[in-house]
């Protein structure tokens, strides 16, 4: 029988020693958000600064401040190359810095739907080394991926090398593949620091109106998916009088956890994973992370399961709620591109748009405020300025602060007229002119 404590001690090294396993010219990936390992990333940044590593490609999703303050700094961009599947403020800042400093492109965007991330990383890209923050080892020799199942639990096992950072603040989360044995790990570092937390954003009046409209579209017994931010929190608050809701979501947020604690979410009407709130990654604050710890009502699963439209559709009355940046007069949505640059990503939006509509009684909801930049720019546009994230043929419900519309079954003329009604009044007349020029009305 393996002595797990001896194995742990043998593999426990300093961060500087651990990152020597990461070689020049290799492909590295890491955990998302709170699962980014700060000690390892800091040691890796120091190696790059000393010129000890070159041409390292880092493939990531939902980059957080830990990576932004260490390996993803402009001065290291000659040595460490960023390949992002989901653009955040970290990448946007680097994009601006690259343009302003040298005109050089230093952020590479990898288009994908989130449910494909595991296959892309394992088969198409090929990850050499994977790094992740984990909870401490139990007496049986298992550590836990905590807040990040997503692609992590799969890639940790397909990468050539696995380095973990043990942190007592990382919760132990029940889930598929969430526990990993000491025998599967190449190196361990210890670093007990509080996990990074999701910032609390201030709501605006338009979001309050949108949240009320969306809540009215959610029936009792619905199975929910939504994202992260001020609007999802408002929507959750507006759902507190609902009954028997379920959770099958890409992102677990504080609002959903609050509904679970209040008994609004029971998961008893789900066809699959009944009784459990299923998610693929969690982002919140310390109290939420503490509530997740060893809580059997939560179950994390890999993203190729959670975001698979065929899996999503197995539950009835799925309601997916996602945001967009632009909606055109045909119903197509651009949720990722702004002012000529990649601003966000496709993420799991299309996964859940398709899965929700395929669900019996399900509906997908795409939402946006009607304007941006202090009401000077309309988010309802004649034609999209960027790529299509959700095609017009997939768009179901659209919601702005001015109302909602179900586009399914409407002609192109009916769509254009109804979408214009959701635009800010200051832009409706011009949109009607544009619609006529496009022969939509």
What is the role of each PLM region?
Residues 1-441:
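Conserved alpha/beta enzyme-core scaffold
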């Amino acid at each position: 029988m393996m002595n797990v404590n001896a194995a742990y001690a043998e593999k426990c090294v300093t961060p500087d020693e651990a990152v020597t396993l990461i070689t020049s010219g290799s492909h590295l990936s890491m955990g998302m958000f709170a699962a980014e390992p700060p000690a390892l990333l800091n040691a890796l940044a120091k190696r790059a600064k000393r010129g000890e590593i070159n041409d390292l490609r880092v493939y990531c999703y939902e980059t957080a401040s830990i990576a932004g303050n260490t390996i993803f700094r402009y001065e290291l961009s000659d040595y460490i190359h960023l390949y992002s599947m989901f653009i955040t403020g970290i990448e946007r800042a680097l994009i601006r810095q690259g343009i302003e400093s040298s005109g050089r492109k230093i952020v590479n965007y990898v288009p994908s739907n989130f449910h494909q991330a595991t296959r892309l990383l394992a088969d198409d890209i090929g990850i050499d080394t994977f790094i992740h923050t984990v909870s401490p080892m139990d007496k049986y020799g298992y550590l836990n991926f905590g807040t990040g199942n997503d692609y992590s639990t799969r890639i940790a096992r397909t990468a050539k090398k696995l380095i973990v950072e043990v942190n007592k603040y990382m919760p132990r989360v029940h889930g598929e593949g969430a526990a990993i044995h000491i025998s599967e790990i190449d190196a361990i570092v210890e670093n007990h620091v509080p996990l990074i937390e999701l910032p609390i954003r201030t709501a605006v009046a338009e979001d309050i109106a949108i949240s009320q409209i969306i809540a009215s579209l959610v029936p009792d017994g619905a199975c929910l998916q939504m994202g992260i931010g001020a609007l999802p929190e408002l929507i959750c608050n507006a759902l507190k009088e609902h009954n028997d809701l379920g959770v099958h979501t890409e992102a677990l947020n504080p609002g959903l956890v609050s509904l679970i604690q209040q008994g609004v979410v029971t998961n008893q009407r789900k066809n699959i994973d009944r009784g459990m709130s299923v998610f693929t990654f969690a982002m919140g604050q310390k109290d939420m992370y503490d509530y997740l710890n060893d809580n059997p009502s939560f179950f994390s699963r890999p993203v190729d399961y959670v975001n698979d439209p065929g899996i999503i559709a197995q539950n009835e009355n799925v309601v997916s709620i996602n945001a967009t940046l632009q909606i055109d007069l045909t119903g197509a949505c651009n949720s990722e591109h702004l002012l000529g640059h990649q601003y966000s990503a496709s993420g799991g939006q299309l996964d859940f748009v398709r899965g929700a509509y395929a669900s019996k009684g399900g509906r997908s909801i795409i939402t946006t405020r009607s304007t941006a930049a202090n009401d000077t720019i309309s988010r309802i546009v004649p034609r999209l300025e960027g790529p299509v994230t959700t095609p017009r043929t997939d768009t179901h419900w659209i919601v702005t602060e001015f109302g909602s519309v179900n586009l399914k079954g409407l002609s192109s003329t009916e769509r254009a007229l109804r979408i214009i009604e959701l635009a800010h009044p200051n832009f409706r007349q011009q949109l009607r002119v544009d619609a006529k020029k496009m022969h939509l009305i």
